[in-house]
């Protein structure tokens, strides 16, 4: 849910023969919540996080990186996509390739840095964001496959 509480974005993930590669935008301002948009992101959308100011939402997609290399939809890397948020309108701003089988994503308090989990590499990708460009600037190795990530408010 956005920090303002007026819109929610959810990933669509489920068991079926194909992939559900989308996110839904939900308007929370009316009498009852309702889906107002469905957007394609990439294969197997995993997680999302709003920036602290609510102006952006970052979404992770495995994008085939957790598949066997022989699979026709295999990709070497997962994906982080950033959308700008204007009410219930989301516009894709930037994307960056990260590690394999990526999962969670979090924003820094100032909205300039993101961390994305890469389960297969036992690592977190460090990404910088300037409002237009998203790029990987480093990596933090961890002892196990990172599968849950949040920030602590201070």
How would you label these PLM feature ranges?
Residues 1-154:
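Predominantly soluble domains enriched in secretory-pathway, periplasmic, or organellar proteins
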